[in-house]
Regions:
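Nucleotide-sugar-dependent
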Residues: 166-179, 190-199
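A short, active-site helix/loop in glycosyltransferases that binds the activated sugar's phosphate group
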Residues: 39-74
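Short beta-strand->alpha-helix junction loop in the catalytic core
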Residues: 52-53, 71-89, 137-138
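Conserved donor-binding/catalytic core segment of Leloir-type glycosyltransferases
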Residues: 84, 88-110, 116-120
């Protein structure tokens, strides 16, 4: 609103939204979901983390907005998977400890209580393993460690882990914790949901605690199988989730968006060029007011783009914006 109402500019908008106040997730009394959607509807594109998350947003938005608006929102919302840097993918460690990692937030929306139940059930069968929960403040259980490290030592610790656990989550978002583990050679068993299928469809999935327990036991006991799944998971990461490839897709879209923007070559444009060339430097306020007598209702964007196509005209970044003529 500010750009449209108090400037002469009419840019194209695209954005990224990591968080939506979904009713099944937030607990506060005044969520901002509808306001967020109204802002997104002004964009040409808005990236979010997963198709699963997009589906949740569309479902909740359909309770308020009509079908035409939902169709527009569907077109705007675009999943953008958070890839990893290729150089951060390390050779898997084949001699790992019997260490299970839960490197997610230990909260209800990450089904942490159920994870602990799975662990307790396994502990009744065996006691030859430990569990690392780095985001848990502390634990009174001797077999759970909550060690915290800087980024590099955190990665080193992940390389020692036998298997990771990716829990059911209410939000349907992307799991950076899981990709952190995979790129460091730690395979994950995952709750059978579309948001994890997007991340790594080659993983082992569970929908019941009994299956999760069986899988964890298999990874603890069968090192060869564990190592095979480590390689398999990393291969999928390399082929599908490299950061620079994901960013290139976004960059290509930005280029397409810019190409769609109009510029006006007209007598007015030539007059503007002549004024800037004659004066050498003109503030935008002078150009609009003193020389053209334009009000804020006139869309200057197409003229501005035409001016900046001139090799001698530059738009300076200053407290008072200027157009400058440089030979």
């Amino acid at each position: 609103n500010v750009i449209s109402n108090v400037t002469h500019h009419s840019p194209s908008y695209f954005g990224y939204c990591h968080w939506f106040d979904l009713k099944d997730v937030v607990a506060w009394s005044l969520p901002s979901f509808n306001q967020n959607i109204l802002g997104i509807l002004e964009m040409q594109r808005c990236y979010l983390n997963t198709q699963s998350q997009k589906n949740l947003v569309l479902n909740q938005a359909s309770e308020v907005f009509n079908k035409g608006t939902i169709a527009k929102l569907d077109d705007i919302l675009t999943p953008h998977h958070l890839g990893v840097k290729e150089q951060d993918i390390v050779e898997p460690n084949k001699s790992t400890d019997k260490l299970i990692v839960f490197n997610h937030r230990p909260d209800t929306y990450k089904d942490f209580g159920n994870f602990m139940k799975v662990l307790e059930d396994i502990r009744q069968q065996r006691q030859d393993f430990t569990v690392w929960i780095p985001l848990l403040e502390k634990s009174d259980k001797s077999w759970i460690t909550t060690e915290k490290f800087n980024k590099q030592r955190y990665y080193k610790k992940l390389q020692q882990c036998r298997v990771g656990f990716s829990p059911k989550q209410v939000y349907g978002g992307w799991s950076v914790s899981t990709t952190d583990g995979i790129m460091n050679g730690c395979p994950y068993i995952m709750y059978d949901a579309d948001y994890y299928q997007e991340l790594n469809p080659t993983a082992d999935f569970f929908s019941e605690n009994s299956t999760a327990i069986n899988l964890l036991n298999k990874y603890l006991d069968d090192k060869d199988y564990r190592n095979q799944m480590s390689v398999k998971s990393q291969q999928y990461l390399k082929e599908n989730l490299i950061y620079k490839d994901e960013i290139k897709k976004m960059s290509d879209y930005i280029n397409d968006l810019i190409k769609q923007q109009k510029h006006i070559q007209s007598d007015v444009t030539e007059k503007l060029i002549s004024i800037i060339k004659l004066k050498g430097q003109v503030t935008k306020k002078e150009l609009f007011g003193s020389y053209l007598g334009w009000g804020r209702g006139i869309n200057f964007g197409p003229y501005r783009r035409a001016l900046l196509r001139n090799k001698n005209i530059y738009d300076t970044i200053d407290s008072t914006p200027h157009y400058c003529w440089i030979e």
